[in-house]
Design a protein with these regions (language model features):
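C-terminal motif of bacterial Sec signal peptides marking the signal peptidase cleavage site
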Residues: 4-6
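Inter-heme linker and motif-flanking segments adjacent to c-type heme-binding CXXCH motifs
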Residues: 47-48, 74-77, 102-116, 129-130, ...
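Gly/Gly-Pro-rich "capping" loops immediately C-terminal to redox-active cysteine motifs
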Residues: 39-73, 82-87, 121, 136-162, ...
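C-terminal capping alpha-helices of c-type cytochrome domains
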Residues: 86-108, 178-204
Length: 204
């Protein structure tokens, strides 16, 4: 009887570990199923799709968790992400965030000539560097932006400009984005997209 109980306990622990681990949740979508699986849009290694689904690999776990919480609470607008986040409980969101934070960051594709030609380090330094770090590597105050798809970065900046996105707490991003001209938004997006990704500490 004791042996049977111990065996049962081990199986339960193993089932929970494999059934609710961050990678398994990202692959399966949890209660939401394949339609809401992270890998459907963000790729099997969190590399993004080069368009409207950003790179997740190597981003700080705390940042990733906060974005899922904000989507679930309706503080950040995106219909699919809202539903995907709501299908996960708070513990599952933590596991998914830790999974992607532990993956090695990688660029989806090499920099284009257009991106290199549009590089504007001076504009980035004055508008973004204080919070997002040199070459967009991220700081404790802002997530990494380097190697994210230019389309995605442009979309996010435009969302900040019209207050569609406003989940930064103190609204620094809201105010900064609204100061940018359309051409500057594009230049910044292309500049950041060309910078190779770099690992960041897992506890950031």
């Amino acid at each position: 009887m004791v042996l049977a109980t111990a065996c049962s306990d081990r199986m339960t622990s193993s089932d929970d570990r494999w059934g609710r681990g961050g990678e398994l949740i990202a692959m399966s979508g949890g209660e939401g199923g394949a339609r809401y699986a992270c890998v459907t849009c963000h790729g099997p290694r969190g590399e993004g799709n080069g368009f409207d689904a950003p790179r997740l690999a190597g981003l700080p776990a705390g940042y990733l968790q906060k974005q899922m919480e904000d989507y679930a609470a309706g503080l950040r607008a995106h219909e699919v992400m809202r539903d995907a986040a709501r299908f996960l409980d708070s513990h599952e969101r933590v596991r998914v965030a830790n999974h992607y934070a532990a993956l090695p960051p990688q660029a989806l594709s090499p920099a284009t000539e257009e991106a290199i030609a549009a590089a504007t380090p001076g504009l980035y330094a004055s508008a973004c560097q204080q919070c997002h770090g040199v070459e967009g590597v991220g700081t404790v105050n802002g997530p990494p932006l380097n190697a994210q798809p230019a389309f995605y970065l442009t979309q996010q900046l435009q969302d900040w400009q019209v207050s569609k996105r406003r989940n930064d707490g103190n609204h620094v991003m809201l105010k900064m984005a609204q100061q940018l001209k359309p051409a500057e938004v594009r230049q910044l997006s292309l500049y950041l997209a060309r910078i190779p990704p770099r690992p960041v500490p897992l506890d950031r």
